[in-house]
Amino acid sequence: MRSLLKQFAFSRRLLKVESCRITESASLILLPWASLIQKLNRVPVIFLLDQRKRFSTMPEIETNHRDSELFSPPSEVRGMTELDRTAFKKTVTIPVLKVRKEVVNKLMRSLKRAALQRPGIKRVIEDPEDGEGRLIMLDPYKMFTVDSFEKEELSILKQLNVNPQISKYNLDLTYENFKSEEILRAVLPEGQDVTSGFSRVGHIAHLNLRDHQLPYKHLIGQVMIDKNPGITSAVNKINNIDNTYRNFEMEVLSGEENMMTKVRENNYTYEFDFSKVYWNPRLSTEHSRITELLKPGDVLFDVFAGVGPFAIPAAKKKCTVFANDLNPESHKWLLHNCKLNKVDQKVKVFNLDGRDFLQGPVREELMQQLGPLSKERKHSVHIVMNLPAKAIEFLSAFKALLEGQPCGSELLPIVHCYSFSKDANPAKDVQQRAATVLGISLEAYSSVHLVRNVAPNKEMLCITFRIPAAILYKNQTVNRDNHEGPPLKRQRTDKDF
């Protein structure tokens, strides 16, 4: 009996079969234990003691801290500030399925769930012990034993006469096989936030690194380039957008210093020098939202137009567009992009301060749009003010803007004004600040849309309202029913977020 016990051992670990050929008798020995596994909630593993062929165990794979490190880079890379790709070599043991090469294509369509998916790793390789065989790499977090296969998968295996027995394989990993987040999490100090996301502007990755990440900035930049096809330059913003022209000073972390770029947004093409103008790819949805509010024939005044993400789509929609930007570079690229998108005949472009634009070209056009001769006008007038840090201050330009002018229109202009807020109730905060500047409550006139979360406790919002006649036509008696138009359809208010 003792000699028999020496040939067996019990373990709580899951059985894994090495990459070796297994005798048929060995497989038969294991089958009676299948029901016992379920009852005991443990796996009695039998070791067949044979000099040529043997069973061995593989650590049970669970979702715990140790297992989550299976595909983590070696611990030696912690604290690395200059990227050394050779330091990321590592060998891990993963489950594999042995199959005949002629069934691989049919089988892989049914094993998408179970197959390993890692950057740069082939899911099927040649069996080193059998030139006619293949090894299918399996996901070690999903595939433990034969029972890990789903019913449909087992059915396919049976149809193709494939033994569902799982073997193990030593897989060599290199830098190319790790994801950017895994690399940075392994390099940066434990417990620190990891930067794996960025704003993509053509070939440029725009990062906004925090203080604790700065010692690793060049490594982070290179990783972003390595792991994102098409990215050839990584830059970091090194000051806030608070200057006159809304662009920011940036540092090239890695890659080429060429900041001339081309982007596609909502089927339109924009070209510009990213180091000299403002562009935020995270506003793509907002650009589209405003465009959808416009109808052919409407008039759009874009007070802070940038390189044209509001103006050009509006012109393509057959709106009359007046676009302005104070930055000479933005003005230059706005003209260029209008030609590039073939709307240069539909957009009037200005290079003025926002307030001068409102009190000059906008006022002159409104006098025509809202004058007595425009009684039959059916289209709407929209004014977009996308300068979140300061746009609300420019609302004062509407006060008495048309004072002394005849009030002959029914549809007053609709303003879309953007702002940031750190208030606990950001929508109410924006409404109150806008009302303070205008000197009139906007509660009955406005709706507030949450554009995006900029940072913890900081929101970007858009307040939309039809300018009250009492603001535009100061000290004049007006018929509110005729001049203020229908109430705006409410979008998202402070109650919605």
UniProtKB/Swiss-Prot annotation:
The keyword Mitochondrion applies. Residues 478-497 are annotated as: Disordered. S-adenosyl-L-methionine binds at H287, D325, L326, D353, G354, N386. GO terms for biological process: mitochondrial tRNA methylation; tRNA N1-guanine methylation. It is an enzyme of class 2 (transferase). One of its GO terms (cellular component) is mitochondrial matrix. Its main location: mitochondrion. The keyword Methyltransferase applies. Residues 480-497 have a biased composition (Basic and acidic residues). Its EC number is 2.1.1.228. Pfam families: TRM5-TYW2_MTfase (PF02475), TYW2_N_2 (PF25133). Keywords: Cytoplasm, Methyltransferase, Mitochondrion, Nucleus, S-adenosyl-L-methionine, Transferase, tRNA processing. One of its GO terms (molecular function) is tRNA (guanine(37)-N1)-methyltransferase activity. It is found in: Mitochondrion matrix; Nucleus; Cytoplasm. It catalyses: guanosine(37) in tRNA + S-adenosyl-L-methionine = N(1)-methylguanosine(37) in tRNA + S-adenosyl-L-homocysteine + H(+). Coiled coil: none annotated. Involved in mitochondrial tRNA methylation. Specifically methylates the N1 position of guanosine-37 in various tRNAs. Methylation is not dependent on the nature of the nucleoside 5' of the target nucleoside. This is the first step in the biosynthesis of wybutosine (yW), a modified base adjacent to the anticodon of tRNAs and required for accurate decoding. Monomer. Belongs to the class I-like SAM-binding methyltransferase superfamily. TRM5/TYW2 family. This is tRNA (guanine(37)-N(1))-methyltransferase. It comes from Bos taurus. The lineage of its organism: Eukaryota, Metazoa, Chordata, Craniata, Vertebrata.
